[in-house]
């Protein structure tokens, strides 16, 4: 049993009175929220909403909110999202730059400062390219939250060429009403390539890629993490990827097509690699050789 509270935020521009809104374009506008209002609420349905070359400054709660599928195919290009919570500890922030529920969203060349999350993406088919979001604070060994939250398992999402600063990629199936693995696709379809991952003054337990299954039986069946740079300063982190087992672990016996290769690691105690090369010494003839690669394999 859970108890839910619902809060209706106030927005500078509220399109929720439209039943459907297609091909709307906002260009070269500064939304001065001043910690009093949120930015933009989308219509409950629609296609190809575009916002480009805009500033959304100091939103109280949300920069852009999708309450339905008005974000289907949304384009967010070259915008700046400036938080009202820059002086607040990362774990105490509540504002989110934007969320989506629909598919095929393109997020390109944006900059976002010190929100709780940069993006909460409920759909699949996302292209996240060339952005810089940073979420640090002044704490020593501080906590860091997800910059991007992917809220379904088979995401068909590409994260390429971003500067991911003091935040992580969080991957959950939180939106599933029945979160246990049955006959759906499990966690897969994610490509993370050519990004700069940075962390400063974080706890050693921090991970840049964190999977959190909300039900039992899930596994990873299609993940490519390659050509990235991971760097931690003013301390080190144990490793770059992990699983939050608060609700359930992953089924490692069913993992397949998980690639970690060509990445650079600085300030990381245990780098991850798959496929990996290591030496096995077998002293006597045997039908079965046991190979123990240790902690180098992901997850």
Identify what each model region corresponds to.
Residues 227-232, 237-240, 247-253, 257:
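Beta-strand-rich solenoidal segments
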Residues 1-2, 297-299:
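Short, intrinsically disordered, charge-balanced linker/junction segments flanking boundaries
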């Amino acid at each position: 049993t859970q108890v839910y509270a619902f809060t209706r935020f106030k927005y500078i521009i509220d399109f929720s009175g439209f039943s459907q809104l297609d091909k709307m374009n906002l260009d070269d506008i500064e939304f001065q929220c001043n910690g009093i209002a949120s930015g933009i609420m989308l219509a409950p349905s629609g296609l190809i909403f575009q916002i480009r070359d805009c500033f959304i400054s100091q939103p109280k709660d949300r920069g852009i909110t999708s309450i339905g599928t008005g974000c289907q195919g949304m384009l967010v290009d070259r915008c700046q999202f400036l938080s009202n919570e820059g002086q607040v500890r990362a774990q105490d922030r509540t504002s989110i730059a934007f969320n989506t529920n629909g598919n095929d969203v393109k997020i390109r060349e944006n900059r976002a400062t010190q929100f709780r999350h940069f993006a909460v993406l409920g759909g699949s088919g996302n292209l996240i390219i060339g952005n810089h979001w940073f979420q640090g604070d002044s704490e020593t060994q501080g906590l860091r939250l997800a910059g991007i939250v992917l809220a379904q398992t088979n995401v068909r999402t590409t994260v390429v060429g971003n500067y991911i600063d003091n935040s992580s990629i969080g991957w959950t199936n939180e939106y599933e009403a029945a979160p246990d693995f049955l006959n759906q696709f499990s966690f897969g379809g994610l490509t993370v390539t050519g990004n700069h991952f940075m962390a400063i003054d974080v706890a050693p337990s921090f991970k840049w890629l964190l999977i959190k299954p909300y039900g039992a039986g899930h596994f990873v069946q299609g993940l490519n993490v390659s050509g990235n740079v991971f760097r931690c300063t003013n301390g080190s982190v144990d490793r770059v990827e992990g699983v939050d087992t608060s609700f359930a672990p992953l089924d490692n016996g069913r993992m397949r097509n998980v690639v970690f290769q060509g990445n650079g690691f600085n300030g990381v105690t245990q780098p991850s690699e798959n496929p990996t090369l290591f030496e096995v010494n077998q002293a006597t003839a045997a039908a079965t050789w046991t190979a123990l690669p240790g902690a180098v394999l992901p997850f």
